[in-house]
Amino acid sequence: MIKFVIDTSAVTDPRLRQLFGVNELWEVVEKYLELMALAKLKLGFSFYTTPSVMKEIKGFLERSMCPSEIISKLGVWILVKDVSQTEAKIPARVFLEYVAEVKRRLDKGLRVAEESTRRAMEGGEIGEHIRNLREKYREATRKGLLDSVADLEAAILALELGAVLVTNDEGLCKLASKLGVSCIDPLTFVKTIEEYLNLIKRHG
C-alpha cells in the first residue's frame, strides 16, 4: 500500500488549476479529493498530513469562499496525524548542514541589504528601493530553504510512515532527500494516481 503525505503546496500549486481546468482553489481541492477517494477505494492508497498543514489548507480554502461540504471532506480522505516529537531519528549531519546553510543565507541577505542601502543613498524613489530589497532579500534568504515548522513536520511524518512526500517546495524536497524520503511534485502526484487508476480500469 502506497502512502502519501500532503504538504500545503501540494494543494495550492497554481499549476493545478490549469491541469484540472478550473479557476478556484476550492475546485482544485474538489478534484483532488475525488482522485484520492478513488485511489483509496480502488488501489488502497492512503493520504496523510499534519495538523499544522491541515490548518493551513483549511485557511486557504476559507479565504477562497470554499463550500463548507468540501472542507468537511478533507478529513475523510486525508488522515491527520501528529508527528512524534521524541522518537523521530534525524541524522546530526542533516542539522549541521542546515545550520551552515542558514548562516550562509543570512550572510548573503546582509550583503543584499548593504548594497540596497548604498543604492538608496545615491538617490531614487524610496518605494522602488524597498521593493527591490524585499525581492532580492527573499531570493537570498528563503528560496530553496526550509523555513516553516509545518514543512518540517510534513517531512518527519513522511519519514515516520515510510510515505512519499507531495510538495513543490524546493527546500522541503532537499531536506526530504537527505532523510531518505521520496518526494514528488503535485503535478506528478496527480498524473501518477491517474495512471494507476487507468491501469486498473484497463486490466480490471
Swiss-Prot record:
InterPro entries, per the entry: PIN-like_dom_sf, RNA_free_RNase_P
EC numbers on record: 3.1.26.5
Catalytic reaction list: Endonucleolytic cleavage of RNA, removing 5'-extranucleotides from tRNA precursor
Keywords per UniProt: Endonuclease, Hydrolase, Nuclease, tRNA processing
Origin superkingdom: Archaea
Any single GO BP term: tRNA 5'-leader removal
One of the record's GO molecular function terms: ribonuclease P activity
Broad enzyme group: hydrolase
SUPFAM superfamilies, per the entry: PIN domain-like
Stated role: RNA-free RNase P that catalyzes the removal of the 5'-leader sequence from pre-tRNA to produce the mature 5'-terminus.
Similarity annotation: Belongs to the HARP family.
Record protein name field: RNA-free ribonuclease P
Species annotation: Ignicoccus hospitalis (strain KIN4/I / DSM 18386 / JCM 14125)
